[in-house]
Amino acid sequence: MNVMGFNTDRLAWTRNKLRGFYFAKLYYEAKEYDLAKKYVCTYLSVQERDPRAHRFLGLLYELEENTEKAVECYRRSLELNPPQKDLVLKIAELLCKNDVTDGRAKYWVERAAKLFPGSPAIYKLKEHLLDCEGEDGWNKLFDWIQSELYVRPDDVHMNIRLVELYRSNKRLKDAVARCHEAERNIALRSSLEWNSCVVQTLKEYLESLQCLESDKSDWRATNTDLLLAYANLMLLTLSTRDVQESRELLESFDSALQSAKSSLGGNDELSATFLEMKGHFYMHAGSLLLKMGQHGNNVQWQALSELAALCYVIAFQVPRPKIKLIKGEAGQNLLEMMACDRLSQSGHMLLNLSRGKQDFLKEVVETFANKSGQSVLYNALFSSQSSKDTSFLGSDDIGNIDVQEPELEDLARYDVGAIQAHNGSLQHLTWLGLQWNSLPALPGIRKWLKQLFHHLPQETSRLETNAPESICILDLEVFLLGVVYTSHLQLKEKCNSHHSSYQPLCLPLPVCKRLCTERQKSWWDAVCTLIHRKAVPGNSAELRLVVQHEINTLRAQEKHGLQPALLVHWAKCLQKMGRGLNSSYDQQEYIGRSVHYWKKVLPLLKIIKKNSIPEPIDPLFKHFHSVDIQASEIVEYEEDAHITFAILDAVHGNIEDAVTAFESIKSVVSYWNLALIFHRKAEDIENDAVFPEEQEECKNYLRKTRDYLIKIIDDSDSNLSVVKKLPVPLESVKEMLKSVMQELEDYSEGGPLYKNGSLRNADSEIKHSTPSPTKYSLSPSKSYKYSPKTPPRWAEDQNSLRKMICQEVKAITKLNSSKSASRHRWPTENYGPDSVPDGYQGSQTFHGAPLTVATTGPSVYYSQSPAYNSQYLLRPAANVTPTKGSSNTEFKSTKEGFSIAVSADGFKFGISEPGNQEKKSEKPLENDTGFQAQDISGQKNGRGVIFGQTSSTFTFADVAKSTSGEGFQFGKKDPNFKGFSGAGEKLFSSQCGKMANKANTSGDFEKDDDACKTEDSDDIHFEPVVQMPEKVELVTGEEGEKVLYSQGVKLFRFDAEISQWKERGLGNLKILKNEVNGKPRMLMRRDQVLKVCANHWITTTMNLKPLSGSDRAWMWLASDFSDGDAKLERLAAQFKTPELAEEFKQKFEECQRLLLDIPLQTPHKLVDTGRAAKLIQRAEEMKSGLKDFKTFLTNDQTKVTEEENKGSGTGAAGASDTTIKPNPENTGPTLEWDNYDLREDALDDNVSSSSVHDSPLASSPVRKNIFRFDESTTGFNFSFKSALSLSKSPAKLNQSGTSVGTDEESDVTQEEERDGQYFEPVVPLPDLVEVSSGEENEQVVFSHRAELYRYDKDVGQWKERGIGDIKILQNYDNKQVRIVMRRDQVLKLCANHRITPDMSLQNMKGTERVWVWTACDFADGERKVEHLAVRFKLQDVADSFKKIFDEAKTAQEKDSLITPHVSRSSTPRESPCGKIAVAVLEETTRERTDVIQGDDVADAASEVEVSSTSETTTKAVVSPPKFVFGSESVKRIFSSEKSNPFAFGNSSATGSLFGFSFNAPLKSNDSETSSVAQSGSESKVEPKKCELSKNSDIEQSSDSKVKNLSASFPMEESSINYTFKTPEKEPPLWHAEFTKEELVQKLSSTTKSADQLNGLLRETEATSAVLMEQIKLLKSEIRRLERNQEESAANVEHLKNVLLQFIFLKPGSERESLLPVINTMLQLSPEEKGKLAAVAQGLQETSIPKKK
């Protein structure tokens, strides 16, 4: 029993020990550390290998500060369980704390550093160890901090420690330099500790002796940095510290400003910075006052808010700094952003404090803007111990401030700049949104987001997805709207509970608490990080999940948990924002997103009728029950939703659907939209209304407009609450109604403007409009402008006032009448207009605004003929600015353009009748503009506007319509009247030479100088201070074209060599329509650089094909002129959305249909005499022998010229031939068929030698007509005479590649120099500067195109450095070798280093075409060790690079030159004929070049001496064949050569061996030896531009013939013959013996000669391809000639129909409507136009000659 009892007790004792660990934990929690240590030791006696117990025991020893035992316990626990990494750091900290110097601490710190790289704790431990080592440790610590900062530049603690290290060692200058360098870091600028360190360092530096010894500029620069640091520190202190600390810092800021104030002088950086910091000081003072009031009562709030308002007024009125005084772009940007931030915050706080308080700011300024108010402000901010007189605040002059309330437009502009200063902080954006939430205008969130996210699309087509890649600007805008909405509701709830009447709803930005939730902030930060690609490696997946989860909520997808009130708020805000946008695409996107949210709300509204919406637990946007939708509001919201649906239909152009939807809704909003739609329809019909049914339809639309406007007024009278729903003020509705009533009154039967079936001819006389054919803009501000029929009262008062001012000052005073005119404009808060193409006349912004006549569209002074609407494409008006009329004449500016209100009597040209006009002066004023409107107040019967009297009057060259009433009076009584003279010249001219006819786009009366003219002020002249240079008109080549389509795309080009698509550029792809010939073309320029990357005609044979794998891309084949010459390219355009791609396809096909309908605009006939067919026949013979074609090019040119001259003498037929002129610099033919031009001397039968190739504007000479009215024949006769002149135009084609009459397949290079004409340049070019590349004294040993890569250690990846020619160059003097590589086009260095003996090339794993090496590279100007890799396209090129590289190392050691290597696959250069031309004729050339035999080889060899060694050609012309396959006929061409030194296949050669004969040519006096006879770098032969790929057959054939040759061409002057003979079947006998070295050298030279021959063979292939391409172009020209004949016949048929219609119509308006068509097509002279106008009016009978 005793033994069993003992065993039982022992087991119990053991179990108690095992439980000791748990007892120890309990005692530890009870803070009984001794008992805990006792029990854990008891436990360890049983379980000694438990690492948890050892660790717990170490913790207990650590609490007792027994470091040694604690370290030992931790070490034992780590041995038992090694994964406990934190114990390593714990041991290191304990040993460093105990100042252990036996090396253990260093060991454990280094061990911990490996486990925790970059840990701040490790840094502190290392710093502690190095501090203990004295001066040596200081140096090590400095080096270590520098290396750590290179890896982690944003580490605040490490930056501060480095600056403190400098300061402790009295290296204050280095400390200041470090502070200045780190100021660019945004992370450091937002740290309070760092800014405190900077302020202390700069203050210490200014007070030190070092600063006193330095120059004055250094002191001023340091003071500038100190002020900037104070402003930043003050902002951070207000945000994070208490009031007392903020007051102390503000007082220190005050002292710094006072210190700098005494040193101000002149315009320098310190003065500009001081002025800006003064504004920040007062702004921060106002924020501090409001922060002090947070814990005060109502009385204290009143006093503090008034003082804060004073501070904000001063801060807002400090002007923006002159940033040009700041050195460096970074400093300028910083000061500019700080100024915008100050003005934004101060301006918003002024509006915030004065809201609801009338004259609040005025009372504040009157009360406190004096000495006593300054004392009150000083006492409120600073302590009473400081001296007021020595402070900046106490001594500043604040008595001259004004009461100036911020303008909303200015605030919106400042907000955009302030967003950059805060780096897109969500707190700042929310604060700005809250400020705008209480203002009548909408916040510019769209502009804010565009500023932050430049490349983000505005809307996505995939609203149903939640992928982070689909996020767009509208998603972020909706998010910000939601954050501002919920934050505003939260502030309102807080203010309702406890809020002082003087406390602003939203405190200043540094003072207010967080305005967004943590979830909202984390989502916003995640979005910004992903978009700007700043995610930490490994963290991107987590951020994507955060963004993806909330996108569902923002797009109201399933289970979104949004409050219906928030959805309604989003829908209304987006609709309102969309109405204010100008672009129709933007409108569609905004209103489309609004419709999306309305569709999500409507089902919820039905649920609300039954019960309430459940609230989620943790929503992204908090629900507020105060804005819950009530059942009584549901009907109103449903009505708003359907109105938005109808607006979207209207924006999309579905007008009928929109009208139907609006008519079903009985609301003032729908009435207003219906009135806008019908009024717009009436305007569109009114512009072209000719027939009575059209006029009746116009009246019906106006009646509907009137009825809807009356309904709005009636509803508003009965219920005033409906006025709030109107999108415009009620006054605008009444004004529009008044205008419509006036228009209806004008339509009344027998009215003064409705006679002879003419609809308001007085207005339409010089009024023209091109209505938008597809869409209606619903913006009354943009679409509906009107003018009262009589001048308003304010206009008369304004004129008298302006005259009085002009008499007093005797100078021209510019007056801005925009405010006066604002009540006659439609309000701007409505739908924005659709985007319209060029040429669609926009509205002017003021009555009587001078209007610029655009060259891209129909002039507003022409009335478009309704009978020839689709054909009216000829001759755009000259770029003329009309002169201005007197203010007595009433101008009307409407959507249609420019009109003049006249009386029923119409216009009267010439001298008016004496009895009807008061004689004001004997002659017009000298500076009077051409439009002279007389005062009609004293007239008995108003006769309208009087024209004439001087040459400065209107000359209506192309206007042929008559006015109503009396019609035209041609001024027969006036001998000075010249009728329609000067056709095609400027419509409005002025006698005053200095009177610049500038366009007044502002629509003001700024330039209406006539009312300000007095007799005393006529001779006033102001000399400009700085003479401006002559204005140079920018010519883009698109002047005579109309933009039919424009969209941003990414363009690609298919590279046939590598069979890949290559990106060509990003930009706007345009479809332009030529106003002269009606042909459309496609043009695209790259963004920013504006380089043309696509420029070609659109033809009926082009087909759009979808790119495989994408529904957003189209590809097509076209003859492109982007590089100046036609080149067959396969292009592809990628659009943002499939909808945009489909729209492009529709517009493209529409242009192709347009080509079928438009007749040729130049009515001449091209006749083919058969000479082109002869050329083609001769060219075809080249397939059987290129020698015939060669002979034709050289010997038959005389015949071609004779035939051409003979053909030109046959009249019109000869003049219309295609001319081929030989170029004296080019043996190939230059074909000229793209410069047909109609000349003034076109009646001459000879072909003119020069012509002006220009747009047919009014400035060009008057052209003779083809169909001519013979002056000697009475009646109406036709005589047909030649008027065609085909000539070479000396003017260059415009850069966009457009030329009138050029066929789309034309590919001919033209040279204007051969005409012998010289044109003085408009802008003289600077002197030619010789370009030095640094490679002048070096020979190119190796050169080939390659792709270079650089290894980036930070990311551990290879990064592409550039694509270009990599060269190995050797210096002639010191024999040093280096590698140089420049990028294509930009020519920037991407590799530049020496080849050293220790360098070695190694193959990259996985490929044999890539070489890797390490070098000290100088590409960026500084020495930098780089790991480089180069990749070649072909393996043999890579091998040759390695070979030359190794030879270079050997050559440097031996101090010898390297034998150059000529790349057989040189970098391809641009070809004038295009690479596609070679590919088209590949089969033909292959037949002639695959095998070389017999005499062909001999002829080929004879060309070697003639070949040029030039690597570049200066002329982009087609070279003749250098190497022709043939026999004896070719030898005659080169018969001038003295000898054939290298002949193949000549069996008759004396002493020949293998048929080879070698003769060294003598050196001539005037030329060098042949390139084959040269050595070194001079023996290179570069293939020409049209180069084919290598032909292995040729290489093998030629190499085999010269493989065993050991003879070369020596350089001696005497002729030495080396002959080798070999009997049949016997070995060769040598008649001359050579040493081994000579044989090796000569064999090498012979091999190089064979390589050169290979190059010539390839060049010959390319030349043959050029000739075949010319054949193709000749064929295309014949097709074009035939097509022109057909078009000319159709054009003549059309003209015949027009003339017959003219003859058989009755005299009057119907005949007159055909006058512009006949005038344009027949090119009538002024006299003929006058006769034709008389016939149209019935004043002269039409006589048709009878047939004999």
UniProtKB/Swiss-Prot annotation:
Region (Disordered): 751-796, 1198-1233, 1291-1316, 1565-1606
Coiled-coil residues: none
Comp. bias intervals (Polar residues): 1220-1229, 1565-1578
Basic and acidic residues bias (residue ranges): 1579-1602
TPR repeat start-end pairs: 51-84, 575-608, 639-672
SUPFAM superfamilies: PH domain-like, TPR-like
Stretches assigned to the GRIP domain: 1685-1735
Phosphothreonine PTM sites in chain numbering: T14
Pfam families: GRIP, Rab_bind, Ran_BP1, TPR_2
Compositional bias of kind Low complexity: 769-788
Keyword Aminoacyl-tRNA synthetase: no
Keyword list, A-Z: Phosphoprotein, Repeat, TPR repeat
Bias kind Acidic residues: ranges: 1302-1314
InterPro entries in the record: GCC2_Rab_bind, GRIP_dom, PH-like_dom_sf, Ran_bind_dom, RanBP1-like, TPR-like_helical_dom_sf, TPR_2, TPR_rpt
GO cellular component: cytoplasm; nuclear pore
Any one GO BP annotation for this protein: NLS-bearing protein import into nucleus
PANTHER family named in the record: RAN BINDING PROTEIN, RANBP2-LIKE AND GRIP DOMAIN-CONTAINING PROTEIN 1-RELATED
Protein name: RANBP2-like and GRIP domain-containing protein 1
Upper classification of the organism: Eukaryota, Metazoa, Chordata, Craniata, Vertebrata
Gene assigned in the entry: RGPD1
